Structures are given as structure tokens and as C-alpha cells.
């Protein structure tokens, strides 16, 4: 990563601050955009204008859900000693020089507030640390987390307080992060706004088409094409079970890919046996052939019509809003008393009579 970014190894690892640019990184730190007290006003947050903003998806196996990295929460800590097995010394030096120990976390025991032990679950003499402010986080941390995959690359361990335990028994647990594709293999929604101001594109790796085996790169030709998803035809019990797994894993992507406002900016690159995926022993010729298809996919997008795309997105957004507003209008009369009463953060479920 440092070599690609043009950084001298003596300058330290590539950080998110390098990508943001010096001015944007300073604004990020000043506004504390990665903290709970960050300003909510879009006008204030709009002062942060990075030259390049990188986000990655990673899957938390312990909490069985995906997360965006850099994290938007401060609940995950790392152990400097544990991470010696995962990252080189200069990456850990950057982390340790810019991070800090977490503030005390307490729980009530016998009527007294008692601090939860924040020492590593494996190294009892080492305190865990919070990740530094996002501009100071090495990019390789997110890359390593999002690329982890069972058997091939080890998952990355963090630690977090388990608040699901009973009061008095809460403490740190190990929390494992692996490949973001375990939860969503095509998170193009990462980059979307309801009404886009800039185009975003995706390349989707798929199987060859049965009727067009020689067409290795494909993009729908117009608004009326690509309306239906590819059928997953199976004729055996094994195929059925495979379809069950694929549906559980890919149903979100399956709904998005043929949707209006999505399919016009997605190019299929079709891969055969021995290409892509978990094939780690591809020949240089195979890799070059895949690279050529990637070039062709980019060329398919050269005639992308952003005006047409914005019109389609506007129509779908307005249609969705109309449907939502109609439902809100129908229910609004019954919500008046609750809205006037306001929100009670300390409200206990099941205590309606107390209100």
C-alpha cells in the first residue's frame, strides 16, 4: 500500500489522513467527526471535504453483522501485544503513538459503581487501547479486516465490553472481524445518496451466460433491459441446498442488481472455472485475461448517461417517498399525543400505565 501510494517506508504507513488530504484531516480532527459529540448539522459536517474518502465493509463474526470501517463507534479496542501477530512493527508504532487507553467503563455492583477491567483477555498486564482518530488510522488495518477469509487469511481480533452479561459480570470479550463479503458481496449502496450528485459504478463477477458464452463483459443496453435477475436453475438436491445458501447470502445483492438506478451503472464480468474467487493459483495469463476484461468493463461505462441516471433515480425516489408519505399521513392522527409528549430516554418498556 505504501509503495502504491508513493510513500517512503521511513514516513510511516499510509493513513486515512493521507487520503483525506492535510486540510480535510485537520477539519475532521477539529470537528471530532468520529465521536458521539460530533456536530449533527449538515452545514457544519459539510466543511469536511476529503480529497479521497475510503470506506470498507467488514463482518463481525462475534456480533453476526457487518460494520463500516473506519468504525462509527468507539466500542472496539485492540491489544497492542495481540496485534503483533497481525501487523508489522511500524504500523503498530503509528497506532500506539496516536491512540489512547479507553475511558473508564463502570457497572453497578452492590450499589457501588465499579470499573470494568479493561486489560486484554489474553495478556492480563496489557491494557487495551482505542483506535486513534480516523485520520491517524493506517489504511492497512481496514484492508486486512475486509480481506480476512476463513482458512485463507486469519480474522482480526478486537475486544469489546459485553453489555449483554448481567450487571456485575460484564467484562471484555474477544470480537473477531472477517471479510465484508460474508455479509454483502456487492455493497454499492455504500456510495449512494437518495439523489446522487456524482455517478458511482460497480463491476460484478458472475458466471458465463448459457446462451452467450463468448460475451464475457455485459452491461444492460437501456432502461428497458436487465429487468429480471439471472435464474439459478437446479435439478438436484445438492443444487437445491446450494440455492438455499446462495439465497440466504446474496438476497440483498440480488434485489439491488436489477433495480432501476442500479443496473445502468453495473457491468458484469463473467468468469469461468479456475478464474477469480478463491482460485489462488491462477496463471499469469489468466490474471492478464481478467485484467483485460476489467478494462473492457470500464470502456462499457464510457457512454454512461448521468442525466438519464439522475432522472431514473429521481423518479424512483419520488415514488418511494410518495408511498411512505401516504402511510405517514394515514397514521399521523394517532401519533399526535405521543409527539407532543416528547421522548423519554429513561422510559422502561412495559410501563405504559406510568405515562
Language-model-detected regions and their locations in the chain:
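Patatin-like phospholipase
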Residues: 1-355
